[in-house]
Amino acid sequence: IYSFDGILISLHGHSPHWQKNIIKIKDEERGEVVTWKNGDKTLFLNDDLPRHFPIKESSPPNISNFSPESIPEEINFIPVSQGLEFFFDLEHKYDIFDLIKKGAGDKYSIHGEVTSPFDYLLNLFGIERAMVYLVQEPSKSKEILQRYTGGVKKIALEQTQHNIDAIKISSPYAGAGFISPAFYKEFVLPYEAQIARVVRDRGVHVYTHTCGAIDDRLEMMVEAGISGIECLDPPPLGDVLLDDAKKRIGDRIFIKGNIDPVNVLLLGTEEIVRKDAEFRIEVGKPGGGFILSTACSIAPHTKRENVQVLRRVAENIN
């Protein structure tokens, strides 16, 4: 339909028997509500990420009496969003990689994904409390980050054994909307750099996905030893100007993104999308290292025709 040339495996470890855990599915105007055997409910929205409602709310731990050693060496879940944790079926941890490779062959670029240790920290304590702990308990926060880093590295290394072309480090909370450049350098960079290093040592490319405003930390992101950066949201969603980013870091890593997924792709006409895509290619193409893409995810209500324009523009410009 869209002629994309890559497949991102953002979740893995699906149980082949997951449907057996469902008690009831109820259709609502906003989407489907699934009730699970343990009593939890998940609202699968028509136009947004799922929202999970556990039957019993659990309070996050307090860092003062939390032991970093209590974090298992082998991480068994992905902190997806809004408190939802996706747990692996350890007997089928990477089945999806092999299934996709079998179906796609060498026709598509296949990417795995791991989550930044910083996200695991935020998931553990809750975003607001975790941010406070960075100020109040920086040393212990780093111990926890290092513990999670070990587990994420293990997942990344396991993914490299499944014929993938690259691994994405999902790090959506590491932009200027959440932390300063100084905090990025202290609490994000050292840990993502460790992940990048072990992946690159396996001969697999690795790139970082950070949403929003990242103009003030582009060079620091490159210091992690990554192969590329994804998103580079332009104003007003972010603050990255493609020509400036290209001059500053384009000779060291690849750049993927910079098309506004809201104001251009969702709200724009086909002509607006065409002109914007042509501009991004004109700026990004010289010297290579630019991948035409939306800055972040495509909004659910985006017209199919607008997305299809991107492929036509890429083919016409060659």
Regions found by a protein language model. Give the residues of each.
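Catalytic domains of carbohydrate-active enzymes, especially glycoside hydrolases
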Residues: I1-S10, E158-D165
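A structural signal for short, well-ordered beta-strand segments and their strand-loop junctions
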Residues: G6-L11, S109-E113
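Active-site loop segments of alpha/beta catalytic cores
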Residues: I55-N318
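Short active-site-adjacent helix-start/loop capping segments
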Residues: L8, S15-K20, Y120-L121
